[in-house]
């Protein structure tokens, strides 16, 4: 029998929904957020029920938020607030502190390393993860799925990530929830404080609402340069 390095039978699984915002080699702030739930979570059901109650048939995308959609976006935050079975971690790369793309020598490697840190910080002890990552266009030579899995497993010293696959955001409501959380948490870093005397935008109000309603549950961590130093996977 092949001696594969596999976790024990019955190891609990978690699903990680990974989304990014920004252009890593261009924007002042680039971030990767990961929403994690157990495989038996009823959070998807609760989000689906809210979608049905609210009559919302579109996708939740922070970048497309306007006044008309603010109520239903806040409702999504309320569903998350009222549910305990999830976690969210966001890794923020600030180019003023460290230009990750320049240090890595490649913007796609930079994205992989930032994503790997977010996934690693999302891992739950004694579990194995499957990562669903929002579709991100890369050249054919970039093996994002393999590289992120290798980086996280190498750092953990075991098979904590079973696989990574890129999917479109319309495949799952929680992929869209990860998009909303990622965008809302990064927004204040990009836009600064609200201007006094001016009505805040819908995005600003949702960002403030998410911070208030999910206080302590959506930590933002700076990118750790040690992920750059992690040896690359053998080609």
What are the roles of these predicted feature ranges?
Residues 1-235:
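Phosphate-ester processing/binding pockets and catalytic centers
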